[in-house]
């Protein structure tokens, strides 16, 4: 397989040495920072009267005695709705969450498009500045008259935050060895849960939303510098375009980071590895197979080479040619079509259920901070456990999903038909949330593995877009559907998702698919369930 040859080529740069662990830690911190709005947003929408009844009474009493009381006002200015005085305007409160999800959806769509024109590292660098600017914009607003700028900043935060997350995940998936791919993906996704714990504690003790935003700005700038000077693009992107010069520069940079640059140059110039490079670079699609698929002529696309040459480094090269196939072209291939459509459905349903359950859990009685922190703690643990389970051979990706779907289906049915004491209800909710987060982690890993390199990023971005649409719809369904009926619907949806998994291939222990041709030649694709 071509992927095995590429992994052998990556190994001479010491790809399994400290560079991949540096990237893992860097992108974990990036995910913690980019997702900081996940725990912060509920607090910004929280009405202070609910949390501080006694202090509200004190505020009213002191207002009767004095025309102003700065300390009390400062105490209550910890959220957007209190600072802008929109406690009674449910429409504006609702817009805060809606515009955030709109930004997330725009980010996944943008990723599916611009990754065909820009390298992943360049996307990371541009998005870092956009993310910093959008956070800064929201922290400079003090007047309700400019509330629209808050909403605009939320859109840009969601857009650039998603671009940072998805680009970093793709880079990590493509540079690490196949036996560590799922584990690394799960650790990076743990950033979402860890950010919930970290920023919730900050919010709980500081109770001023601006501090969380200032921390995110400072951390974003540090991450930008580390990405710019200490990381490299995925070489697969340039291998796909047969750009050997950039591939060498990237691998040489990784070898330099690992302290084995001299050994790398010696091996790279050896006859063995030069032959390996020629085999990788001269690889072409078998046109007979693609014609048999749908009689589509791909020769012009597959044989196109990049004419722009590197001047000094990968940073100064022009973006790769538009060799990646669009998702609409990939729909013409039966081998890709059903995978793409099924994953769109699975992403939509998974995100819809996940966000609705999050809203359901946050509405439970008890200490609000405690519920949020426990919820995100469960999510972090779920990502790690799921990352371990999907590497177990007899479970794999699909087996893990079946087990998790079974657990949450039982949980939904119990909650929809039976009444439990509060501790039991809380426990069932956290178990369901645990499994739902684990399922989402599996799809992050699985989606990138199931597609060949030419369409991997594009189709991944479109699949996540469908998931974000589900996130937008979730609050409306949660608001207008009775809880027992909602849980029953979710139970039926999980059963339907389990049925759809039958038609998808197992990817555990298999190399990443590098071409449409490899996908067409895999007779077991779409039929394996082991």
Specify the residue positions occupied by each region the protein language model found.
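C-terminal transmembrane helical hairpin of 12-TM major facilitator-type secondary transporters
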Residues: 399-442
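Hydrophobic transmembrane alpha-helices of multi-pass solute transporters/permeases
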Residues: 1-66, 71, 82-129, 160-167, ...
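Cytoplasmic helix-loop-helix junction between adjacent transmembrane helices
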Residues: 157-187
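Loop-to-transmembrane helix entry/capping segments in MFS-fold secondary transporters
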Residues: 90, 178-187, 453-463
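Hydrophobic core of transmembrane alpha-helices in multi-pass small-molecule transporters
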Residues: 148-163, 424-438
């Amino acid at each position: 397989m071509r992927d095995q040859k590429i992994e052998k080529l990556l190994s001479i740069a010491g790809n399994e040495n400290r560079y991949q662990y540096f990237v893992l830690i860097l992108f974990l911190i990036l995910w913690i920072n980019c997702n900081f709005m996940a725990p912060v947003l509920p607090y910004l929408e929280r009405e202070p009267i609910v949390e501080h009844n006694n202090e509200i009474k004190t505020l009213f009493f002191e207002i009767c005695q004095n025309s102003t009381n700065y300390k009390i006002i400062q105490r209550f200015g910890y959220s957007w709705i209190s600072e802008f005085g929109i406690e009674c305007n449910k429409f504006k409160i609702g817009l805060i969450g809606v515009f955030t999800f709109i930004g997330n959806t725009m980010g996944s769509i943008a990723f599916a498009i611009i990754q065909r024109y820009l390298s992943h590292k360049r996307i990371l660098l541009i998005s870092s500045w956009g993310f910093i600017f959008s956070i800064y914009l929201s922290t400079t607003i003090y007047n309700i008259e400019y509330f629209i700028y808050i909403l605009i900043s939320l859109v840009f935060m969601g857009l650039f935050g998603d671009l940072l997350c998805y680009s970093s995940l793709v880079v990590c998936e493509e540079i690490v060895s196949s036996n560590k791919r799922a584990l690394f993906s799960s650790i990076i996704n743990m950033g979402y849960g860890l950010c919930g714990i970290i920023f919730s504690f900050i919010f709980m003790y500081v109770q001023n939303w601006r501090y969380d935003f200032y921390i995110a700005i400072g951390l974003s700038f540090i991450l930008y510098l580390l990405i710019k000077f200490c990381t490299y693009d995925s070489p697969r992107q340039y291998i796909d375009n047969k750009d050997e010069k950039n591939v060498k520069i990237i691998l040489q940079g990784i070898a330099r980071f690992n302290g084995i640059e001299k050994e790398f140059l010696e091996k790279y110039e050896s006859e063995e590895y030069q032959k390996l490079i020629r085999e990788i670079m001269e690889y072409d699609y078998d046109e007979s197979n693609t014609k048999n698929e749908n009689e589509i002529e791909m020769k012009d696309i597959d044989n196109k080479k990049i004419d722009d040459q590197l001047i000094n480094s990968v940073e100064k090269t022009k973006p790769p040619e538009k060799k990646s196939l669009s998702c609409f072209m990939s729909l013409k291939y039966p081998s890709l079509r059903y995978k793409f459509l099924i994953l769109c459905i699975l992403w939509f349903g998974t995100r819809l259920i996940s966000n609705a359950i999050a809203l359901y859990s946050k509405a439970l009685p008890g200490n609000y901070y405690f519920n949020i922190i426990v919820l995100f703690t469960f999510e972090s643990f779920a990502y790690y456990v799921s990352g371990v389970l999907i590497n177990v051979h007899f479970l794999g990706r699909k087996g893990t999903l079946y087990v998790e779907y079974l657990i949450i289906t039982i949980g939904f049915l119990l909650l929809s038909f039976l009444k439990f004491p509060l501790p039991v209800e809380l426990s069932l909710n956290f178990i369901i949330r645990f499994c739902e987060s684990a399922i989402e982690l599996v799809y992050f890993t699985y989606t990138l593995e199931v597609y060949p390199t030419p369409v991997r990023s594009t189709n991944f971005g479109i699949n996540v877009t469908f998931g974000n649409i589900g996130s937008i719809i979730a609050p409306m369904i949660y608001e207008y559907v009775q809880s027992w009926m909602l849980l029953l619907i979710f139970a039926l949806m999980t059963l339907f998702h389990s049925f759809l998994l039958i038609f998808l291939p197992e990817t555990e222990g298999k190399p990443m698919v590098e071409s449409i041709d490899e996908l067409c030649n895999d007779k077991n694709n779409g039929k394996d369930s082991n």
